[in-house]
Amino acid sequence: MKDSHQTIGVFVRPTHYQNPLFKELEQAKEWVLKLLEDEGFESFMIDSLDGAKDERLIEKADAFLCLGGDGTILGALRMTHSYNKPCFGVRIGNLGFLSAVELNGLKDFLQDLKQDRIKLEEHLALEGRIGNTSFYAINEIVIAKKKALGVLDIKAYAGHTPFNTYKGDGLIIATPLGSTAYNLSAHGPIVHALSQSYILTPLCDFSLTQRPLVLGAEFCLNFCTHEDALVVIDGQSTYDLKANQPLYIQKSPTTTKLLQKNSRDYFKVLKEKLLWGESPSKKR
């Protein structure tokens, strides 16, 4: 067993007892902790997704198991991002696009992990800053209207060079890993998850000529709006953006690290999870 993965922190998003998955998650938590012990791993539970509260636990772990869906994985990845440690997802719930394995395949995955038969994928992440507040995004940063009515003007700059003004409901700045999330729903392009780029996809733009734009990750971007707006991180947290206040976005110096099976193939995942390339009439 490699020393680098001896201690596993287990993330579980807190779930209300009325949630249909509550009972399944409660049972799975105990089973996972027992399995980790049986396979020779030290483990502990992190079930608050509160970075300040769990900082010492995060420092203790060598890797993190995320029990749940993609939302749980995204929250854990952001919380652990600055610690430069890998996560892997065990799917319970819906899509599970980022997950490494189903619950019934976890034992085999852990055995492969002990034998170093697991691959480490490193993905581009975004680092954003508003004033003195910095944050990371795994899938996307969205600039959105605060008001239900009207059009939001967003001026976009690459460094100090203005390159576009978006007029609409908002703008998605996505990572390649996040290109299959909100970006895809907004008719943005699928970009291979290991690419080094940003995807800028306008939301309900007022102009017929506006189209999604893919930029190299070497650019430092900044944006400002003509009125107060919201900045949404991975669909899970929000920040206020004041009128004419700059939002700076650049490639994070630390990558998003996911442990995956050696057999995982990106294009196969697209077909299985999103029915990519399938006929609309074909049933799953």
Swiss-Prot record:
GO terms for molecular function: ATP binding; metal ion binding; NAD binding; NAD+ kinase activity. Belongs to the NAD kinase family. Transmembrane segments: none annotated. Its main location: cytoplasm. This is NAD kinase. The keyword Ubl conjugation does not apply. Keywords: ATP-binding, Cytoplasm, Kinase, NAD, NADP, Nucleotide-binding, Transferase. Involved in the regulation of the intracellular balance of NAD and NADP, and is a key enzyme in the biosynthesis of NADP. Catalyzes specifically the phosphorylation on 2'-hydroxyl of the adenosine moiety of NAD to yield NADP. NAD(+) binds at residues 70-71, 139-140, 167, 169, 177, 180-185, 236. It comes from Helicobacter pylori (strain P12). One of its GO terms (biological process) is NADP biosynthetic process. It comes from the Bacteria. Signal peptide: none annotated. Its EC number is 2.7.1.23. It catalyses: NAD(+) + ATP = ADP + NADP(+) + H(+). Its cofactor is a divalent metal cation. The active site is at residue 70.
